[in-house]
């Protein structure tokens, strides 16, 4: 599971399910840059989802052009419950918590059963302060491989 923290959206209707549509969001560009892979023509993450990755924001909606506009409106209750349920009922998950808002969710996770990776948010404003070079994707695959679980083709 990847918790992107609070998302801002620059355009209306540019996110569908757990994926961005249209031109990649700046955060998606930063993620692919860190992976050393070419930036895709869209921000669609269906390929990751089909391998078991669950990208989720702490707050699932936002008013266009208003960063964090739906914070403290109830989404956190739902997303916290999702994180707790996954932590309690599954084993050997990798939680990537990006940004201070997402990092605060670590208390919901049983860290003895799961790998928890934290760093700054992958936004263009903060990625250079710890996201680049954090190696979360290779660390996740190392953990999965060590548990006999198929790696993710990021």
Model segments located where?
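A polyanion-binding, active-site-adjacent surface
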Residues: 1-97, 101-104, 109-118, 122-127, ...
